[in-house]
């Protein structure tokens, strides 16, 4: 059956979006704890609304961190520094409700885990089970240099640029909340050929006109990010399509940690297991196994074994080995998917402690992932974005 040209859309949000404020607070707390106690267990959830932040969750650690201080510093860094923005780092209330990790959950994870991944024997790694059941997906494709789908790649770059021009005062009337959305047209062979539609909604000072915003965002944001050859006379632009976006951030909408899981991953281009990332330490396979699955998929594509690859991992609580490993290349594989699964098993340790060791995940590296995507990042060095296994995979595949 002949494929037709089609459109695909992905969105991103700025760091000032209410849900992303929560992700950044949760990961800032996680980083602060990991910087003092690498073996802490952290499951930290945040909610924000007008004038209020609530931090809740389960944290087991030998250290102390000043959670309200971290919350205020994070909000200040995002840019909510004045009451007229509807949310102010200095004056908002901060409530905390923290418990220890459940003993029933800890029982399945604890054996021999203490700070020893680097020196652990294979038997000890095998003894450490997953902290929960669940399924996780990782994806990569050769549409962009960073091996990510083009729609989410452009949406993230637009969102990041919105923040840059706000913070460097290029467009000083912008405020922290904002969203971007990019629709890409694909040809009959599934290759991206043009940008069909760009949507940007950004919070702003009440006195600026829509005409100014429209002109400035096209000039300083869209032109600076989207390659000219991808846009044409038919490309549609919707800039603040409601005409006004003054009330935003937590005053406009309540926010929660883990509510932007598609923005965090592949923009809907690949499947998602449902687990969120932010606020969770690496013993939570929701996070660590999703990072490992991306690492596997990216190395498969970087090795030239497929044009696109989706990897699924699944776990049972208290069991170290994945209950399943699946690879789908959507008909683009240069070797069979059975061969790819065998290559994955032989080259990647996908047991929870093995992932932590392989990707060095007991470090305070997570706040930087909490806005603008966890994957395809070229601005920060993330271990799961490396392609250091590609050469070995290619050689073992006989290519």
Swiss-Prot record:
Pathway: Amino-acid biosynthesis; S-adenosyl-L-methionine biosynthesis; S-adenosyl-L-methionine from L-methionine: step 1/1. GO terms for biological process: one-carbon metabolic process; S-adenosylmethionine biosynthetic process. Its main location: cytoplasm. InterPro entries: ADOMET_SYNTHASE_CS, S-AdoMet_synt_C, S-AdoMet_synt_central, S-AdoMet_synt_N, S-AdoMet_synthetase, S-AdoMet_synthetase_sfam. It catalyses: L-methionine + ATP + H2O = S-adenosyl-L-methionine + phosphate + diphosphate. Its cofactor is Mg(2+); K(+). GO terms for cellular component: cytoplasm. The keyword Transcription does not apply. PANTHER family: S-ADENOSYLMETHIONINE SYNTHETASE (PTHR11964). Homotetramer; dimer of dimers. This is S-adenosylmethionine synthase. The gene is metK.
């Amino acid at each position: 059956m002949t494929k037709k040209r089609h459109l695909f859309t992905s969105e991103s949000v700025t760091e000032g979006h209410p849900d992303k404020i929560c992700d950044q607070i949760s990961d800032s707390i996680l980083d602060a704890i990991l910087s003092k106690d690498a073996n802490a267990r952290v499951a930290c959830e945040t909610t924000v609304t007008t004038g209020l932040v609530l931090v809740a969750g389960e944290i087991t650690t030998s250290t102390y961190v000043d959670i309200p201080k971290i919350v205020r510093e994070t909000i200040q860094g995002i840019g909510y520094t004045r009451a007229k923005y509807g949310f102010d780092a200095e004056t908002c209330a901060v409530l905390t409700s923290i418990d220890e990790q459940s003993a029933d959950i800890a029982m399945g994870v604890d054996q021999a885990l203490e700070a020893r991944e680097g020196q652990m024997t294979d038997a000890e790694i095998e003894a450490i089970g997953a902290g929960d059941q669940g399924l996780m997906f990782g994806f990569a494709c050769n549409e962009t240099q960073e091996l990510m789908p083009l729609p989410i790649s452009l949406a993230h770059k637009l969102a990041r640029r919105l923040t840059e021009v706000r913070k460097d005062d290029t467009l000083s009337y912008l405020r922290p909340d904002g969203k971007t959305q990019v629709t890409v047209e694909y040809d009959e062979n599934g290759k991206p050929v043009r940008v069909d539609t760009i949507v940007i909604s950004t919070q702003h000072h009440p006195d600026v006109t829509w005409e100014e915003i429209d002109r400035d965002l096209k000039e300083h944001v869209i032109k600076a990010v989207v390659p000219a050859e991808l846009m044409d006379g038919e490309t549609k632009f919707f800039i603040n399509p409601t005409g006004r976006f003054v009330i935003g951030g937590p005053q406009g909408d309540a926010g929660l940690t883990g509510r932007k899981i598609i923005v965090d991953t592949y923009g809907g281009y690949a499947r998602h297991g449902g687990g969120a990332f932010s606020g969770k330490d690496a013993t939570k396979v929701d996070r660590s196994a999703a990072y490992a699955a991306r690492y596997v998929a990216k190395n498969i594509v970087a090795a030239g074994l497929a044009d696109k690859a989706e990897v699924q991992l699944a776990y049972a609580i208290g069991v170290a080995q994945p209950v399943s490993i699946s690879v789908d290349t959507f008909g683009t594989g240069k070797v069979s998917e059975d061969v790819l699964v065998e290559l994955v098993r032989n080259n990647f340790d996908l047991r929870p402690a093995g992932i932590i060791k392989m990707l060095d995940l007991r470090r305070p590296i997570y706040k930087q992932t909490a806005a603008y995507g966890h994957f395809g990042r070229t601005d920060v060095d993330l271990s799961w974005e490396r392609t250091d296994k590609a050469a070995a995979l290619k050689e073992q595949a006989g290519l």
